[in-house]
Amino acid sequence: METQAEQQELETLPTTKMAQTNPTPGSLGPWKITIYDQENFQGKRMEFTSSCPNVSERSFDNVRSLKVESGAWIGYEHTSFCGQQFILERGEYPRWDAWSGSNAYHIERLMSFRPICSANHKESKMTIFEKENFIGRQWEISDDYPSLQAMGWFNNEVGSMKIQSGAWVCYQYPGYRGYQYILECDHHGGDYKHWREWGSHAQTSQIQSIRRIQQ
C-alpha cells in the first residue's frame, strides 16, 4: 500500500514538453519504474510513470538500483537525457552493472530516464545503410542479430539508419556489448542520417549487433 505522501508525489511527477519522452493517448503503456538511492532496492524509493529529466530534482543524488514493472525505458548517464544510454526492460536491476555491465564501460551514474513509447517487439522493422544520408548498400532488418557480420553485413560500421516501426537498441560490439544506442521510429521521424544523431555519447559509427526492444 502506498502512503498518502507517496501517492501525492506520484501525482506531481515532472513532465516535459518533448512529445517523444512521455506516453501519448493511444500508445501501448502503461509505464512504471521504481528507483532507489541505494543498491539492492534499499534506501529512498520513488515510482514514476513518465519521464524524469533530473533525479536530483526529486532529492536523489543518483539511481543505484531500480525495478521496471511495465514498459521499456531508457536510462541516461547525465541529466536532460544526455550521456551514455542504458536500455531498461521489464525486470529488476539491483546494481548499476545490471543495466550497464554489458556496456564494457564502468559507469555508475544514472541521472535521467524516460519511457520508450514506440517499442513494439512483434512488429519492428528498420533499414541500415552503408554510408551517411541513406546511401550505399542497405539491409532491411526485422529480427535480432547478435552479430551483423556473421549474418552477412560486410563490415563493422553502419552509416545511417531508418526506423520504420518499433524501437531498437544497437550495440558497438557483437553479442550486445559496448555502447548502447536506442533508436525509435518516433524520434527524428525515424530517420538517423548520421551516427552523431544516435545520441550525445556517440563517437563512432561502429555497430555490430542489433535487437528489438521488448515492451
From Swiss-Prot:
Molecular function GO terms recorded: structural constituent of eye lens
InterPro entries from the UniProt entry: Beta/Gamma-Crystallin (IPR050252), Beta/gamma_crystallin (IPR001064), G_crystallin-like (IPR011024)
Residues where N-acetylmethionine is found: 1
Keyword Protease found: no
Biased composition (Low complexity): 1-16
Record PTM S-glutathionyl cysteine, positions in chain: 82, 117
Region (Disordered): 1-29
Post-translational events: Specific cleavages in the N-terminal arm occur during lens maturation and give rise to several truncated forms. Cleavages do not seem to have adverse effects on solubility.
Keywords: Acetylation, Cataract, Disease variant, Eye lens protein, Glutathionylation, Methylation, Oxidation, Repeat
Residues modified to S-methylcysteine: 82, 117, 185
Region called Connecting peptide, residue ranges: 118-123
Keyword Ribonucleoprotein recorded: no
Gene3D superfamilies: Crystallins
Record domain Beta/gamma crystallin 'Greek key': where: 31-70, 71-117, 124-165, 166-214
Role of this protein: Crystallins are the dominant structural components of the vertebrate eye lens.
Family: Belongs to the beta/gamma-crystallin family.
Connected disease: Cataract 10, multiple types: An opacification of the crystalline lens of the eye that frequently results in visual impairment or blindness. Opacities vary in morphology, are often confined to a portion of the lens, and may be static or progressive. CTRCT10 includes congenital zonular with sutural opacities, among others. This is a form of zonular cataract with an erect Y-shaped anterior and an inverted Y-shaped posterior sutural opacities.
Subunit structure: Homo/heterodimer, or complexes of higher-order. The structure of beta-crystallin oligomers seems to be stabilized through interactions between the N-terminal arms. Interacts with CRYBA1.
Record comment regarding domains: Has a two-domain beta-structure, folded into four very similar Greek key motifs.
Protein name as catalogued: Beta-crystallin A3
Lineage: Eukaryota, Metazoa, Chordata, Craniata, Vertebrata
